[in-house]
Amino acid sequence: MSGFNFGGTGAPTGGFTFGTAKTATTTPATGFSFSTSGTGGFNFGAPFQPATSTPSTGLFSLATQTPATQTTGFTFGTATLASGGTGFSLGIGASKLNLSNTAATPAMANPSGFGLGSSNLTNAISSTVTSSQGTAPTGFVFGPSTTSVAPATTSGGFSFTGGSTAQPSGFNIGSAGNSAQPTAPATLPFTPATPAATTAGATQPAAPTPTATITSTGPSLFASIATAPTSSATTGLSLCTPVTTAGAPTAGTQGFSLKAPGAASGTSTTTSTAATATATTTSSSSTTGFALNLKPLAPAGIPSNTAAAVTAPPGPGAAAGAAASSAMTYAQLESLINKWSLELEDQERHFLQQATQVNAWDRTLIENGEKITSLHREVEKVKLDQKRLDQELDFILSQQKELEDLLSPLEELVKEQSGTIYLQHADEEREKTYKLAENIDAQLKRMAQDLKDIIEHLNTSGAPADTSDPLQQICKILNAHMDSLQWIDQNSALLQRKVEEVTKVCEGRRKEQERSFRITFD
């Protein structure tokens, strides 16, 4: 055993110790024990050889041991070991509570850990345990059991007793044993522990250097490294199931485990030197879970005069693998983030374009809405004007009817008196003047219509011409020619005047020259 230890059997091992233990040949007990033998660890004082003690025969006994003579000094728990079970157990002796009338084996096994009623139930629950050292503890145990030579078969289902080597399936509590071949736990084990294979102590000859591979990955609480000679794995829900391997690395377990120390995170190589041998431990197995730092199990029937191997801190192996996987994960995450960023930028660009179009359409709609509103106001005004005009026309029509009503009796009176009234000269002139006024009025109306037509024609002709109309193009060409001809005419008139002036000057000079010639020759 290594580390801070309150109990355990075996030879003095490496660690912090203040005394030299005697060589013990009793069967070791591992687990949660307050009785200390000659083991290494944090001890003050050295116990003597263990004395024999009679196991208790009560149903719930506290394993009263025969105290041995102690040496003087300041010691912590130097109780002697009995040939029976050690540790904190309830009813380790002959069980009074037996499920079948079977005889208990005379040789008591080493109940490991915290055992409740470790009676020998051989035929009660359809399981047979054949062991050279003793019967494996049954019941609710928290520690690994002893090493068994012959494999035993266990029935599947809900079992409280475990065979030595068979693979129990289902809900299993306290099933333990050894197997020649390593198996991996299939479900949630609570304490897969590996017994330590340590180097020989000072009282034994040189032993071969055992090499075991154990690795612990995950959160292990107060866990230490122990080498494993053999391994046995259980399937199902097990509490404190030891895992021992023979020549092969133990498989990793995952889940909540009340495991014994013997698991380290990563791959580590540790060399511890005892009196005659060197143990090199290379961790390769991995266990993940929640560990409560139970002590490793020493094989039953083998003296524990061995030195425990101390494991170095976990190496960078597992961290490197995890870093590689995490780096790949980060790269994939970065690529996904970049892809999503590009897609987001593209979508944002499209969204901005569509938002710009929608904004333009919204402005157009707002402007058109304002125009429609103003047009509606104008239409309302026109409707009001039309209503007033209709009222005025109705008023005029009513006045005209009244006037006609007033004129009709007067016309009748005039017709009655027409035969007696003679037309005078003034009346004839008035009639002519009236007819002339009617003619002038008709002519004015025609002139107004003609002026209206002329104005409309001028408006249509003054409008910008259509450039695509060929007539308009021809008109433009003709206008350009006309302008050119006018310019030529104006310039030709100027040239004509200049030519006439030059001609006059030439004629005058010619006459002067002729006159001078005549004077000279005369």
UniProtKB/Swiss-Prot annotation:
Transmembrane segments: none annotated. Keywords: Acetylation, Coiled coil, Cytoplasm, Cytoskeleton, Disease variant, Disulfide bond, Glycoprotein, Host-virus interaction, mRNA transport, Nuclear pore complex, Nucleus, Phosphoprotein, Protein transport, Repeat, Translocation, Transport. It is found in: Nucleus, Nuclear pore complex; Cytoplasm, Cytoskeleton, Spindle pole; Nucleus envelope; Cytoplasm, Cytoskeleton, Microtubule organizing center, Centrosome. Pfam families: Nsp1_C. GO terms for molecular function: chromatin binding; Hsp70 protein binding; Hsp90 protein binding; phospholipid binding; PTB domain binding; SH2 domain binding; signaling receptor complex adaptor activity; structural constituent of nuclear pore. Sequence repeats lie at residues 6-7, 44-45, 76-77, 114-115, 142-143. Residues 328-458 are annotated as: Required for centrosome localization. The modification Phosphoserine is found at S408, S418. Contains FG repeats. It is linked to Infantile striatonigral degeneration: Neurological disorder characterized by symmetrical degeneration of the caudate nucleus, putamen, and occasionally the globus pallidus, with little involvement of the rest of the brain. The clinical features include developmental regression, choreoathetosis, dystonia, spasticity, dysphagia, failure to thrive, nystagmus, optic atrophy, and intellectual disability. This is Nuclear pore glycoprotein p62. The lineage of its organism: Eukaryota, Metazoa, Chordata, Craniata, Vertebrata.
